[in-house]
Amino acid sequence: SSAASDVYKRQLFQYPTEKSITRMAKACIKRLQALEDDSLVSAIASQPTDVAKQICLYALMKQSRLVWEFMLTVIGEKYRLRDTSFGKIDLNTFFMRLQEQNDTVASWSDTTITKLKQIIARVLVETEYLDNLKADHLNPVWLHPVLENAIRSNGDMAILPAFNCFS
């Protein structure tokens, strides 16, 4: 698809190979198509990289309840409390709480949980919530109006705190 090749040309995702970039772009576009939001699909190709990354994060959150919950209950709550500290303990606490609340999550192997923690941490770095995997603080994020409008029109206002948006 042209959006996928555009994502590749602009190096939207910092991955070394064209194949992995194209795969990620296609996954993102597939998630967006599931949202049935043409404005966001076209914004991915036309907006600056940081906006496109935010849109991809939102699409991932819509597709993955786990990511939605993490972004809302951990990241959103930290922004709400103006607590910029962040570390492995935040990921560990989140997964421990989930394991206590949910039998399915409780049945997951340690390997699976570790992999999910790595994925979430990488997503936070790619979307510039964190400077790198060793970062000990959250960066302030600014929700782009294109995405904010889409979130509101999709009735997803509950997720706005994950984007440091409280208005």
What do the predicted segments below correspond to?
Residues I29-M61:
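Long amphipathic alpha-helical segments with strong coiled-coil/leucine-zipper propensity
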Residues T22, K26-L35, Q118-T127:
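Basic amphipathic alpha-helical segments that dock to polyanions
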Residues V41-I44, L81-K88, D103-W108:
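Short acidic alpha-helical/loop segments enriched in Asp/Glu that coordinate divalent cations
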Residues G87-Q101:
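DNA-recognition alpha helix
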Residues A106-S167:
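Accessory, usually C-terminal, subdomains that scaffold auxiliary metal cofactors
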Residues Q11-L12, P16-I29, A52-Q54:
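Hydrophobic, aromatic-lined core segments that form the binding pocket/scaffold
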Residues I55-Y58, K62-T84:
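Positively charged, polyanion-binding regions of nucleic-acid-associated proteins
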Residues S1-Y8:
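Short, small-residue-biased leader/transition segments that mark boundaries at the very start
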